[in-house]
Structure formats: C-alpha cells, structure tokens
C-alpha cells in the first residue's frame, strides 16, 4: 500500500499543543445507569466508518474502543460489546504527525495491523462497516464484499470481508443477535462519495435512499419488535475539514488585493470549496493565478493552470449535496417518529461545532483541520474527543426518549486534543496562512489520500 504522506503548514500554531490521547476505556466511578423504558442488555450498532471508530485513515483497536457506540455501550451497561478488533498500526496504517515544524503527517514506516478476532463464533455487536451505505445493510447478493465499484476498491472489499465475514447481510447479523437496542447511522457515504470526488460520483437519489431506509426499518420492526432504537442523522459533509481547509482565493503579490484561485471553469467563486486532495496541485502552483501568493508553498509561484474538477466542489454542487443531506435527514426523522425511536442529531452537533464550537471545561473545540481537536488527521473522521461528544449526544437523546438515566462519558479522558488556546482567531479565517508566510512549507499529498469511508 502506498504511504499516505503530506507536509502541512503554519507550524507556529501547533507549538506547545497536545495531541489527542488514545487508550483503553478506564472504569469511571459514576452512578449506575438506569434503563428506564429501554433495554440495553444486547446493544448492536449499525453504520459507517464513523460508528466503526475509523480515525486518521484507518481502524485500530485503541480508537475502536473510543467510538461513540463503544462508549455508549459502556455507559449504558450493555452486557458485552464486541468489535472487529484491529492491531497496531491499523488497517490501513494510521497517519501520524512526525514533525511539528514543519508539520509532517504520514503513515510511512508504519506496519499494517490485522483483524485479530476473526474466529469469534458470533457476529460482532459493532456491525458498522467502513464504506457502507444503507443499501449494503440489506443487500443479500453482494453482502460479503458490497457491490464492487468500478474500479474495485480493495479497502472497501477488505472491510466487508473482515467485518461481515460471509456470515450474512449486515441486517441479518444484527437481527440474529436478538438485539434489545439498535443504533443506526447511515447516509454519510451516500453523499460523501459525491462530495469528495468533486461531485464526479452520482448522488444516491433521495427517493431511493428513502425507500431503502424504510425497508431497513420495516425489517427491524418485523423481526426485532423488542428492540429499542436510536437513529443518527447525517452530517453536512461540506462543513468538515476535507472541504474547508483551503480558501478559494489568495492575494495578489503586487497589490495585496484578494484574487480567486483558478478552477476548471475559471476563477473560483467565494462559495466554491477546494478539496484537501488539491494539496499536491497547489504545492506546485496549480490553481494559483499568475502573480498570486501561493499560501501552500510560497516557493512555487502560481502558474495559472486550473485545478481539476475532482479537486473543487462548486457552489451548485455543494447545494445539491446539502439538499441531499436534508432529504436524508427528513427520512431519518420521519422513521424515528414512526418507530418511536430516539433521534441523535449528529448534523446539529456538527453545525454547532463548525459555527460556535463545542465547549468543555473552558476550552472550545472546533472543526479546523488538526488544530480544532474534533477531526482526525484524515480531515473526515472524528477524534476520540469528538466521539465523546457524540456519545453524550446519544445518551441525552436516549435518556429523553426512554426515561433512562445513563451517565455522561467523562470527556476528560480524551480532552487532551488541541484546545482553544491554540486556535487562530475566528475572525482571521479563512486565510490563516497569509500571516507569517515565512513559516509555510510545501504540501505533497497523493490524490487518493482520502476517499469516502
């Protein structure tokens, strides 16, 4: 597997900062959970890489055991919560920071891990599969590898083969455990694939998502009528660091006036999004207008050549993705109402994080890449700390719906991620690299460093 490597910028922002801590969940002295009208004895989770605990480009046990689903099971007092455990250094090997000045992030030199409990005779309680969509949950034809994309994605196939293990569909394996509580988190990959490709991948139509989601819910109602439910909304993926890190404009070296980057259709508009995968192009001056300041690599003058369509999400494409997210969330909200399920508003939590930030013990955590504390090094997936916030969001929703009294996760266990004192002033965005230009350095990033999970 090719090493995923990139150099990053503005190292001064990171000096003195602490990185997110990882580790096993320790016992917390808290009041015992009271289940109210719910039953958490056999909790099974369905979902995508978010629920699986994918972080910084891969799966590894010390992050899988910090996923919101794992934390919820711990807090709610589930009898067990098995996961498809992955040894260090992860599958694929996780990204890491090797240098702060300049910031150097890579998985080079790391050893691929392995799935360590494939022989478990029962299905896992965490049946979330990275790359999966709601269709994959009910698909009975390609259930062990998912519908092969064109060209095939070996990581996608690897995840299905090692988590589903040819034991039946995801839904069949969930229902076969006699679940008393199920959480469902689908919809992100239906839109993330289109968004992360610059909208080069077609969106799943809202009516089709609605029909498949309804099929999933109908089967659960029929074959697991005893199960209480928590349904998770779809976050607006256009607000995550993968889409918000690079501004669509720079400044003129001669006048200091703002000038637009060059996209496939000409100058970018203020609402256009430059994807993180454009980093390698920007580093050699592509996308930077002639005479414009290269905020990624000042040593490489702008050459005026346009960025590729796959590196830019224009305002119309962003609006289409946001519309699809809204439609999916309408489906999920309606399903929660019909089923009497708890609704976990992950979309609302991300909206709060990307505007005012999330607050804990005097610190503010935000969605800024690396420095914000909420997103891992792949720019897409939550950190351990963010999973703690999500777990508490789920706990609040379940407590309110079922009259339960589940104690919150102690966020202090994960709150060593970059804190508010290291944030650039919010008013300085979206051009944090213009200041202190002598501290900037080149970026080199393979175009496939991040794909929809």
What are these regions (language model features)?
Residues 46-49, 184-189, 197, 232-236, ...:
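Active-site-proximal beta-strand/loop segments in catalytic clefts of secreted hydrolases
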Residues 16-42, 405-418:
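Bacterial Sec-dependent N-terminal signal peptides
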Residues 24, 92-142, 244, 249-453:
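Conserved catalytic region of serine esterases and O-acyltransferases that act on ester linkages
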Residues 43-57:
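Catalytic nucleophile-elbow at a beta strand-turn-alpha helix junction centered on a G-D-S/GDSL motif
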Residues 77, 176-177, 212-230, 324-345:
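A structural motif corresponding to the C-terminal end of an alpha-helix
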Residues 45, 63, 67, 71, ...:
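Extracytoplasmic/secreted proteins, especially bacterial periplasmic and envelope-associated proteins
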Residues 1-20:
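Sec-dependent bacterial lipoprotein signal peptides
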